[in-house]
A protein has these predicted regions:
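A short beta-strand-loop-beta hairpin characteristic of the jelly-roll/cupin
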Residues: 132-169, 176-179, 184, 312, ...
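Asparagine/serine/threonine-enriched low-complexity, disordered tracts
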Residues: 2-27
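Contiguous mid-protein beta-loop-alpha structural module that forms a pocket-lining wall or clamp
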Residues: 177-231
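Short amphipathic alpha-helical linker/capping segments at the junctions of internal repeats
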Residues: 172, 214-219, 334-343, 352, ...
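Intrinsic, low-complexity N-terminal interaction/targeting segments
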Residues: 115-118, 125, 137, 145-147, ...
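A short hydrophobic beta-strand segment most commonly corresponding to one strand
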Residues: 147-149, 174, 188-208, 319, ...
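A short, N-terminal "cap"/entry segment at the start of jelly-roll beta-barrel domains
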Residues: 2-3, 27-122, 219-294, 298, ...
Length: 420
């Protein structure tokens, strides 16, 4: 059902000029060098460690190299979930589970390296939610922020803090943290499937999770549908309204058609990024920043036949194929994809994309934790230095072997390449 990269040093070691030996002939990543913890065990030290352990204490030097690695060592592995394989199982949940009993009828996508967190990659969660014809879910709110990307169906709606939004295929919508929200499907003919993205693993890692059920079970939506789109969707800031001061975007939904057209227009005006093609970020129209404090989202276009160069960055990314077909090479593993497929790139993993269609463009939607990385000054990015910017591929097609990938070493203090 899904493909994973393998825990094989050959995937990584040959795919990067790691510059591990510096100009002075010293291995930059040698844990036996001065400046790293290199204390050898002795009987006296072992006895000392036991004394410390009895007091719920320990010696930092025994774990220092592990908890302060030379470079990021994500537990997540590059993974591809094929939509056409998952879709029948998502539909199968309709008669098996009542939505009111489940809270949300969602098939979550779990990274084999992050099962304990129910995460898709890093500290990001994603899943496929299905709503049958005429269904309406009860309202709740939680500390986690959420976003939606519609895979299929024309009747989807959501109510966010009293504002009703109608969304269709490939539309993007947000449910900021702490907002009351409920969802439904007003179609009488077909189900709706949309992709959820949340920062639940991050919230739980910080022990900050809260959850509430709406006291009336359902909200009372305002009279104007899609009012945020009508107010903020025209690339102009409205006057005569209450000043927006909340830490997330007042625009809550981005329809597919104008978003795709914006990519086409940008493709006429600019060459784009060598690493991401023609790429744009969904933004808060008031600040110009990311749509929410903990998650950002992008839409990118790969021209017909285009192959990007490889780069890597701190921060995890979940990609969804909105249009077309192609392939991505992630940490030396090739993943072929088509519309609807979902794949992930762990933090600090080399990755590049290619459009396999010589006549039509391909479009990728993605969401990430870049706002967190940037707000904490953790963001770093670098270009792949060898082979004209392309990784050697260890295997033609990634095979389903569920083991973590050891990330390759490179510059420990990398300067940002072109900002994404």
């Amino acid at each position: 059902m899904n493909d994973h990269s393998v825990n094989d040093h050959s995937v990584n070691d040959h795919s990067v000029n790691d510059h591990s030996v510096n100009d002075h002939g010293v291995n930059d990543y040698d844990d036996t060098r001065a400046g790293r913890a290199r204390v050898s065990d002795t009987p006296e030290l072992k006895a000392y460690y036991e004394e410390l352990g009895a007091l719920q204490a320990g010696a930092l030097w025994t774990v220092a190299n592990e908890i302060e690695p030379w470079y990021p060592q994500p537990k997540s592995v590059p993974t591809l979930w094929r939509y056409q394989e998952l879709r029948p199982l998502v539909h199968k949940a309709l008669p098996l589970v009542r939505a009111d009993d489940a809270g949300r009828r969602v098939v979550m996508l779990v990274n084999p390296g992050r099962k304990e967190l129910s995460a898709a990659v890093g500290l990001l969660y994603t899943g496929l939610q299905i709503m049958g014809p005429g269904e309406a879910m009860t309202a709740h709110r939680h500390q986690a922020a959420a976003l939606r990307f519609v895979q299929e169906g024309t009747g989807a709606w959501t109510v966010v803090d009293g504002q009703k939004l109608k969304v269709g295929p490939r539309d993007f919508a947000i449910t900021p943290n702490g907002t009351w929200h409920e969802h439904g499907n007003e179609s009488t003919e077909a189900p709706v499937i949309w992709q959820d993205g949340l920062d639940i693993p991050l919230v739980n890692a910080l022990d900050a999770g809260f959850y509430e059920v709406h006291p009336e079970l359902y909200q009372r939506p305002g009279a104007v549908v899609n009012s945020s789109v009508l107010s903020y969707g025209g690339n102009l800031l409205p006057h005569g309204m209450e000043k927006w001061t909340r830490p997330y975007s007042p625009l809550l939904a981005w329809p597919w058609e104008p978003s795709y057209q914006a990519l086409l227009d940008l493709a006429k005006a600019a060459e784009g990024s060598p690493y991401d093609g023609v790429i744009m970020e969904y933004t808060n129209p008031v600040t110009g920043g990311s749509v929410m404090p903990t998650m950002g989202a992008h839409l990118q276009l790969l021209r017909a036949g285009q192959a990007t160069r490889a780069h890597r960055h701190t921060g995890s990314v979940v990609y969804t194929v909105a249009k077309g077909r192609g392939r991505s090479v992630i940490a030396g593993q090739r993943f072929d994809w088509q519309q609807g497929d979902i794949f992930c790139v762990p933090s600090w993993a080399w990755h590049e994309h290619a459009n396999l269609d010589e006549r039509e463009d391909a479009v990728l939607f993605s969401f990430n934790d870049f706002p967190v990385m940037r707000s904490l000054a953790f963001h770093r990015e670098e270009a792949y230095p060898d082979h004209d910017g392309h990784q050697p591929v260890a295997h033609p097609i990634a095979q389903p072997v569920a083991h973590p990938v050891t990330q390759p070493a490179a510059h420990p203090i990398a300067q940002p390449a072109e900002e994404r």
